[in-house]
């Protein structure tokens, strides 16, 4: 196994870990329960992007910027509204 294969596998593992964490967050927080279908659709699009057009690293960066950070901001805003 080369370094590239190891890095690719590690990146995929991080990607799937983030996916599982965010899916659990969506399921545990009631206002985000309705966003599960939207989130899964988005993750399928990111995976299709990874398979067809971009490298794993680029897709991971896209995932962080356009999925992970916005969901964190939505969660923070919801907590602010509750308190």
Curated annotation (Swiss-Prot):
One Pfam family hit: Papilloma_E5
InterPro entries, sorted: Papilloma_E5_alpha (IPR004270)
BP terms from Gene Ontology: symbiont-mediated perturbation of host process; symbiont-mediated suppression of host antigen processing and presentation of peptide antigen via MHC class I; symbiont-mediated suppression of host apoptosis
Lineage top rank: taxon: Viruses
One GO term describing the cellular component: membrane
Alphabetical UniProt keywords: Early protein, Host endoplasmic reticulum, Host Golgi apparatus, Host membrane, Host-virus interaction, Inhibition of host adaptive immune response by virus, Inhibition of host MHC class I molecule presentation by virus, Membrane, Transmembrane, Transmembrane helix, Viral immunoevasion
Cellular compartment(s): Host membrane; Host endoplasmic reticulum membrane; Host Golgi apparatus
Mode of membrane association: Multi-pass membrane protein
Cysteine-cysteine disulfides: none
Family membership noted in the UniProt record: Belongs to the papillomaviridae E5 protein family.
Assembly and binders: Homooligomer. Interacts with host BCAP31; this interaction seems to correlate with the ability of HPV-positive differentiated cells to remain competent for proliferation. Interacts with host ATP6V0C. Interacts (via N-terminus) with host HLA class I heavy chains A1, A2, A3 and B8; these interactions inhibit host immune response by sequestering MHC class I peptides to the host Golgi apparatus. Interacts with host TMC6, TMC8 and ZNT1; the interaction blocks their negative regulation.
Purpose: Acts to keep host cells in a proliferation-competent state upon differentiation. Enhances host epidermal growth factor receptor (EGFR) activation after stimulation by EGF by inhibiting EGFR internalization. Induces a redistribution of host caveolin-1 and glycosphingolipid (ganglioside GM1) components of lipid rafts to the plasma membrane. Since GM1s inhibit cytotoxic T-lymphocytes, block immune synapse formation, and enhance proliferative signaling by the EGFR, E5 may enhance immune evasion and cell proliferation via a common mechanism.
Additional notes on this entry: HPV16, in comparison to HPV types 6 and 11, is more often associated with malignant genital cancers in humans. Part of the antigens expressed and presented within HPV-positive head and neck tumors.
Name recorded for this polypeptide: Probable protein E5
Organism: Human papillomavirus type 16
Upper lineage: Viruses, Monodnaviria, Shotokuvirae, Cossaviricota, Papovaviricetes
């Amino acid at each position: 196994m080369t370094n590239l294969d190891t890095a690719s596998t590690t990146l995929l593992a991080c990607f799937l870990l983030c996916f599982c964490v965010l899916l659990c967050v969506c399921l545990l927080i009631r206002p985000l329960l309705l966003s599960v279908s939207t989130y899964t659709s988005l993750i399928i699009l990111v995976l299709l992007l990874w398979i067809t057009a971009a490298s794993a690293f680029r897709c991971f960066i896209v995932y962080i910027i356009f999925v992970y950070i916005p969901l964190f901001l939505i969660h923070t805003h919801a907590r602010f509204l509750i308190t």
